[in-house]
From Swiss-Prot:
SMART domains: S_TKc. This is Serine/threonine-protein kinase D6PKL2. Its EC number is 2.7.11.1. Residues 53-66 have a biased composition (Basic and acidic residues). It catalyses: L-seryl-[protein] + ATP = O-phospho-L-seryl-[protein] + ADP + H(+); L-threonyl-[protein] + ATP = O-phospho-L-threonyl-[protein] + ADP + H(+).
Length: 586
């Protein structure tokens, strides 16, 4: 089994893993079959979840589930259950002589027997693949000192509410609410753990089913004693509070959370489509087409805009953390490194590009402007940059003067919701995605998200990050000291390269999005033609193939690649003998 690395240093720990090269091979072990475990009804402490005494249902009104898995447990404790599941789903990590990680993963078929999953009629189809695939980006996190705690926990508080308007038609949400109305409180006794999806820095995640339904969830189980001893309680609390505050189509849903004497559990959305890193590896040339990139980038941008509006600086955007739902749309994940702060959304009058001398020559707003030489102000008129005006033969002297006041269209006010006052000294993120101001220790704010957004865009287009070196040290040096360069292939539009240039300005004050956030980024010509209001109606570049769950057995649909990854799960291994696993799902 994978061992958890002990924290190093006095309050400063590094969580690093070596990103495997694109040519590293992944071996899939033969599927194995095992009997699922029966769960013991746990005793949930009402005070632990904050239910007032007056609102607790009497014990006589709490109906017991008819599921035999709940009424007749085979295990004496949750620890035994989890240990038994873990022993059946171990992913063996092998390190090659070149430092690349080879993953031997078991796609286990679940034979349910007499459990409630087998009793449900028909087969449950989950769009996506249960793929297991390695991920190699080096993630680092300097442990919070007392100053970090005050810096990142004394900001705005997040309210916990069960009101989720975007989940009005979600069957899983309705099932959770029905159980809550019936039993008052949800606990481990209401779920059956089907399979361990993976383990990570602060917990393990299990594919689980709400007993008596066909509703599947990803349950993150964290050992509270381990979190306390490793000083990770703040990270776990931050993640839970952020998840509670979210209600957005491209962000995860926290359906419920509860605690036992030993464990803290988060029940979240199960994304069976994998992540964008895995999906990119399966593309020709291991990079996406520009049209596909525009789709994924646009949805990620809306998610970042929403987070910033709530005063949340994400700080961990990368393909491994962008999951693909069953319908092909995306969902950001993993919020334990996020920074919370105060923000004041305001409506400001928008000025035309021509009236702002600082923005006038930044980029050419015409789609035809694909050459770097075409960046003069004349490109802002609605004509092509390659030839003279074909439909106007009159010179400027012959033209009649226009009434500028009458013809000028007043722009609508813009919503600016950028936490520009956010400030942190923490050293967190992924080596290849770290912003220069983080590396130099100058303190950072929300502009780091626009830097990572640029790296993210670059990787999806070109199949690699722009500043990756031979090692982590060289990578950090390149981020700070090396200029941005673009490869000759694949060929991308000037608008795409110009957007990357604006996002990857090394000085945060000059970075695109620094002042007006997502509003400024969305106005870039790269996004021309994107209908932001109806983006959820757009057809995704790829819709995952279905995974059938019938009679308790997991059957992975045939994939175009032999590499199978767990739904939205990425296991990172540190180079060396530690065999340390970092879980990048949540």
């Amino acid at each position: 089994m994978a061992s958890t690395r002990k924290p190093s240093g006095h309050g400063a720990e590094v969580e690093a893993q070596k990103r495997s090269s694109s040519n590293s091979s992944t071996k899939s072990a033969k599927a194995e079959t095992f009997e699922p475990m029966q769960l013991q009804r746990s005793v949930t402490n009402p005070r632990a979840v904050g239910i007032p005494e007056s609102k607790r249902l009497p014990e006589s009104f709490r109906k017991r589930s008819s599921d035999p898995a709940v009424c007749k447990p085979d295990f004496s404790s949750l620890s035994t259950v989890l240990e038994h599941v873990d022993s059946l789903t171990i992913d063996e990590k092998k390190t090659s002589g070149f430092g690349s990680v080879k993953t031997s993963s078991a796609s286990a078929k679940l034979s349910d027997g007499t459990s409630s999953l087998g009793k449900t009629s028909g087969s449950a189809k989950l769009s996506g693949r249960l793929d297991f695939m390695e991920s190699g980006k080096s993630s680092i996190c300097r442990g919070s000192t007392s100053s970090d705690v005050s810096d990142e926990s004394s900001c705005s508080s997040f309210s916990s509410t069960v009101n989720k308007p975007h989940k009005a038609n979600d069957l899983r949400w309705e099932a959770i609410q029905a159980v809550r109305v019936r039993d008052g409180l949800l606990g481990l006794s209401h779920f059956r753990l089907l399979k361990r999806l993976g383990c990570g820095d602060i917990g393990s995640v299990y594919l689980s089913e709400l007993s008596g339904t066909k509703c599947y969830f990803a349950m993150k189980v964290m050992d509270k004693t381990s979190l306390a001893s490793r000083k990770k309680l703040l990270r776990a609390q931050t993640e839970r509070e952020i998840l509670q505050s979210l209600d957005h189509p491209f962000l995860p849903t926290l359906y419920t959370h509860f605690e036992t004497e030993k464990f803290s559990c988060l029940v979240m959305e199960f994304c069976p489509g994998g992540d964008l890193h895995t999906l990119r590896q399966r593309q020709p040339g291991k990079h996406f087409s520009e049209q596909a990139v525009k789709f994924y980038i646009a949805e990620s941008l809306l998610a970042l805009e929403y987070l910033h509006m709530l005063g949340i600086v994400y700080r961990d955007l990368k393909p491994e953390n962008v999951l693909v739902r069953e319908d092909g749309h995306i969902m950001l994940s993993d919020f334990d490194l996020s920074l919370r702060c105060l923000v004041s959304p305001t409506l400001v009058k928008s000025a035309a590009i021509e009236s702002d001398p600082l923005r006038k020559n930044v980029y050419c707003v015409q789609p035809a402007c694909i050459e770097p030489s075409c960046i003069q102000p004349s490109c802002t008129v609605p004509t092509t940059c390659f030839s003279p005006r074909l439909f106007s033969s009159k010179s400027k002297k012959d033209r009649k003067p226009k009434n500028d006041t009458a013809n000028q269209v007043r722009p609508l006010p813009e919503l600016v919701a950028e936490p520009t006052d956010a400030r942190s000294m923490s050293f967190v993120g992924t080596h290849e995605y770290l912003a220069p101001e983080i590396i130099k220790g100058e303190g950072h704010g929300s502009a780091v998200d626009w830097w990572t957004f640029g790296i993210f865009l670059y990787e999806l287009l070109f199949g690699r990050t722009p500043f990756k070196g031979s090692g982590n040290r060289q990578t950090l040096f390149n981020v700070v000291g090396q200029p941005l360069r673009f490869p000759e292939t694949p060929v991308v539009s000037f608008a795409a390269r110009d957007l990357i240039r604006g996002l990857l300005m090394k000085e945060p004050q000059q970075r695109l999005g620094f002042k007006r956030g997502a509003t400024e980024v969305k106005q870039h010509p790269f996004f021309e033609g994107v209908n932001w209001a109806l983006i959820r109606c757009a057809t995704p570049p790829e819709i995952p193939k279905p995974v059938e769950l019938e009679k308790g057995a997991v059957s992975v649909a045939e994939a175009p690649s032999s590499q199978k990854t767990a739904a939205g799960l990425v296991l990172n291994a540190q180079k060396g003998s530690d065999n340390y696993l970092e879980f990048d799902f949540f």
